[in-house]
Amino acid sequence: MDMNEYYNGVIEEALEGFKRVNNTDQVEQKIYEVPAATWEINVVRGKVLEKATISRVTLDTKHPVTGDDTHFDALQSKVYPLNPKIPVLIFIIEHMVSGGKTFFSGMMDVIPAVPIEDDLRFLGAEMKKVAEKHGEDYEALRQKGSTIFKLEQWE
């Protein structure tokens, strides 16, 4: 399945929205190419969205386990509002074709730029309920996640 038309449409729509919110026509674009991959980065800066990005990475390679020809596409958008009380938005979709199989995944995250203790306690309690519903140990999962995603400068 060729996803180019879809990805190009998403990029165009996102950039139009970023420009409209920031009241600008300017888009910074960089494209990096190597034999197996292309990375396109688009950035809109302004007084509402300090930085809003949408980037696409394409990679054509061999699957490391099967040796099958593999095409990988990732589309990422990250939005950093100027107002620190508005959360950062991250959106990622990925599409891979390998060995005659197609895989599609995605995720979205909203990250508060200024942690509010009441909100963090509420979110933790709700996440604990979800973990318990599925028979998981919330504290063990939280500890595992904190070691995977911990940066020294956060200390």
How would you label these PLM feature ranges?
Residues R56-L123:
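Aromatic- and glycine-enriched beta-alpha-beta binding-site module
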